[in-house]
Amino acid sequence: MKAHALALFILLAACGGSPPPDAGKADIVIAVIPKGTSHTFWKAIHAGAVKASQELGVEVIWKGPAREDDRDAQIAEVENFVSRGVSGIVLAPSDDKALRLPVTDAMRAGIPVVIIDSGLDSKDYVSFVATDNYKGGRLAGERMVVKLGGKGKVVLLRYMEGSASTMERERGFLDVLAENPGIELASANQYAGATAETAYQASENLLARFKSPEGGLTVDGIYCPNESSSFGMLRALQDSGLAGKVTLIGFDASEQMVRALENGEFDALVLQDPLNMAYLGVKTMVSHIRGEEVPPIIDTGVTLVTRDNMSDPRVAELLRPDIDKWLN
């Protein structure tokens, strides 16, 4: 028996003493690269990726630029993970054209890519997991038309050129306005930029163009297509004493924005489901790596939220996702 045990020990040592699959490092390593890391939206994306990694038994590496307009940093992250030979990449492209070649190069190198959140000017990827952003823009436009009774002046504070997701939200909104001749589009050429601070400055500049001699506004409605532009405009309206005096519709949510919806400073918010989006992005990648067929497009849903429905359990979960459960 002793000789048999010794022989078995030597055999295991020669094979590296391979532990059970769940006893060591995960055999699937997925890089999740967001557009940025500062907004609440991206924290929810991070939480969803962590949730998937824990439930599926894979390793997730979270790495992305601090600012959403840092395309070069995001490209460098993609190239770095390709060099490291990760099992797959889940990417939210900051620019629909600038990230096209890095994604193609990754796919050609045998590193599959799942796109989340924002589209790519290419079909050279495994799957696209995202909100129907055009529909979200239309929901905002339809709400604006109803609130203004089909008549009034509206401004759009755009986000940033090259961001496919927000460009679709803007397009959906503008298409609804074009279908309603009683609504006048007073401005659609101002860009907020990638941060809440640049959005605040852009919002102040935009509001200054439409101030009345009495200190009010000569427009009736404002639409902003993402978290930073929405929060920047909210701050500018608050600082001008005009919050709640114009129909403000935003996209996405932070704690400050939810409170502003509760007190009437936002009329409505269009919400995505970022936690589930990232969860499904990682899950789709794992399924692909394991040889399963995955759909080319997965719609993660979009919801218009007002004070009338914000207390519904599912809506409340979208407004305040349990990020801390997965990140702390």
Residue ranges and their predicted role:
Residues 82, 91-107, 173, 192-260:
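Hydrophobic alpha-helical
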Residues 15-19:
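Bacterial signal peptide processing site
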Residues 164-165, 176-178, 276-328:
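Hinge/cleft segment of the Venus flytrap/periplasmic-binding protein
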Residues 96-135, 143-146, 153, 159, ...:
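Flexible loop/hinge segments that line or gate small-molecule binding clefts
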